[in-house]
Amino acid sequence: MSEDTVPEAASPPPSQGQHYFDRFSEDDPEYLRLRNRAADLRQDFNLMEQKKRVTMILQSPSFREELEGLIQEQMKKGNNSSNIWALRQIADFMASTSHAVFPASSMNFSMMTPINDLHTADSLNLAKGERLMRCKISSVYRLLDLYGWAQLSDTYVTLRVSKEQDHFLISPKGVSCSEVTASSLIKVNILGEVVEKGSSCFPVDTTGFSLHSAIYAARPDVRCAIHLHTPATAAVSAMKCGLLPVSHNALLVGDMAYYDFNGEMEQEADRINLQKCLGPTCKILVLRNHGMVALGDTVEEAFYKVFHLQAACEVQVSALSSAGGTENLILLEQEKHRPHEVGSVQWAGSTFGPMQKSRLGEHEFEALMRMLDNLGYRTGYTYRHPFVQEKTKHKSEVEIPATVTAFVFEEDGVPVPALRQHAQKQQKEKTRWLNTPNTYLRVNVADEVQRNMGSPRPKTTWMKADEVEKSSSGMPIRIENPNQFVPLYTDPQEVLDMRNKIREQNRQDIKSAGPQSQLLASVIAEKSRSPSTESQLASKGDADTKDELEETVPNPFSQLTDQELEEYKKEVERKKLEQEQEGEKDAATEEPGSPVKSTPASPVQSPTRAGTKSPAVSPSKASEDAKKTEVSEANTEPEPEKPEGVVVNGKEEEPCVEEVLSKGPGQMTTNADTDGDSYKDKTESVTSGPLSPEGSPSKSPSKKKKKFRTPSFLKKSKKKEKVES
């Protein structure tokens, strides 16, 4: 070692708070157990802890949804690579190994093929409701396999997809009941020809389907048929006595038909004999020395019949083997031992049943579907009756009285902001009236009597249903579900299309009366039953009658006869002549006053008549005008005198007051005479003109617009002045 290289002093290690072994006490039993554990066990526990995180991720529903979304995206792009296939296998594995809602059965299955293997791309070409039908039929095949009723051949379950096209679903030949899936089913027509091939490459058993096609042709009401030939059913079909009413299950089966089946239904005579034996209402067909076929309007009903049929056959076979013959058996009488109807229990003369009607065997079938889902079969069944009932509130918020506290607990959080609290309050107000125990009705009450029309004006108020006098029978319905009145089995896409159509009409401001009822098209309702409709119609009718009274003036001569009209015309002419004579007498008695006396008088009170806008009309010219005009106005009053500064039709009066006063008494009298003559000519032309059909003289088109009429009190004062003078 050289002299230059001198070892440096080692720095002390950093101070640590606590060592690993200092954390445990040597006397701790848990520490001693971990220390004495073998190394391989310790390594296994570490690996399990690492795998636990991976299992949690794989079993999370969010990861599975994200994976399915990724698969659908790649499928839309059309990339059918091996990566997509691997992702789909992972998704199926995750769904099959996920935790069930209920505890799993004691039966141990390492891996099973899911029933609902239809993906989004596969279900686009299916008919309406066909996806659910495929899942139901595949589930029935799995149930037959689980109960041990499946045979290697001729055990077929068929379902009618559509009555219009006569398409049916059947499993392919060579596929066992435990392998049938929704996508592997084949769609065929009534002749057994393939319409839509499934995911498998196996053909259709036309010989086995011939029996089903003959049944469907003979019974159009049947939608599902299950062919069963277990040892018990085959043994009962070989007995001459047939199925005996030994047990309660035999009574639940119902009527049965017996047919000698030779294995084929190719000839027309065999189909006719089958139709005669089957009848219009029978749901069980016994094939002699072969087996039985259960029919049903639905899949649930057909499986219900098969289940009780198999149980009845097993009971009968066991009873006959132990009793030694039919004479030692006690048979049930159909009249005394009646089976209970579906969904009802009769006791003490009353019937108790569910509020919601259910199909035959629906509850039992849903229970079996829940069992398959818990086992991991992924049935894809749509449940109508949920297993866990939602907790209902015993007291509504309306029934609970309002309470206020003036203090805040220390453990309470930060107070809710005002805006957020206001939004929550609005949301509660929207749902408060839907959850209220009280029922309110909109009622129109007569408020007051209108002054002109005299009809009561309705006033809209809200009253409790108990206080309102019901005009029609019925009971109020409490809305518990926003989709309470939506019909069942409706297509959501049709609802969305209709909503978009209505919104488009609102944007374009297109208003119509809405869809018209074909049933009520010819019915004419005398009176609307809706109070709001009555109030709207009443107010609208009052407004219409008021407008008509204001716009149209009644004709006073509409209800007079021709004779009365003639008398009225004569009376009008007589009054005209009297007025003319009085006017002539007044003109003759008038005397021209001195200019000194007439100066202080106003122009209206002067004896001179203001010149009219139109020139004086001669008698000849007046007669010509009367001939030209068909109707003239019956106006016998003298021409009105104009005050000073009056403007008529935008023009000043031609003769001024100063000019009239400057002319003198002689000219004033001559003007008055000429005015009287022209006035007389006018009255003659008026009286000589024809009358209108209403009996009143019409206005002449040649006559100018009227000027200001002299008030009556001024005329009286003028006469008084003349008498005084």
UniProtKB/Swiss-Prot annotation:
This is Beta-adducin. GO terms for molecular function: actin binding; actin filament binding; calmodulin binding; protein dimerization activity; protein heterodimerization activity; protein homodimerization activity; protein kinase binding; spectrin binding. PANTHER family: ADDUCIN (PTHR10672), BETA-ADDUCIN (PTHR10672:SF6). The gene is Add2. The modification Phosphothreonine is found at residues 55, 533, 612, 674. The modification Phosphoserine is found at residues 11, 25, 60, 344, 530, 532, 535, 594, 598, 602, 606, 614, 618, 620, 678, 685, 688, 692, 696, 698, 700, 702, 712. Residues 596-621 have a biased composition (Polar residues). It holds the Pfam family Aldolase_II. Heterodimer of an alpha and a beta subunit. Found in a complex with ADD2, DMTN and SLC2A1. Interacts with SLC2A1. The lineage of its organism: Eukaryota, Metazoa, Chordata, Craniata, Vertebrata. It comes from Rattus norvegicus. Membrane-cytoskeleton-associated protein that promotes the assembly of the spectrin-actin network. Binds to the erythrocyte membrane receptor SLC2A1/GLUT1 and may therefore provide a link between the spectrin cytoskeleton to the plasma membrane. Binds to calmodulin. Calmodulin binds preferentially to the beta subunit.
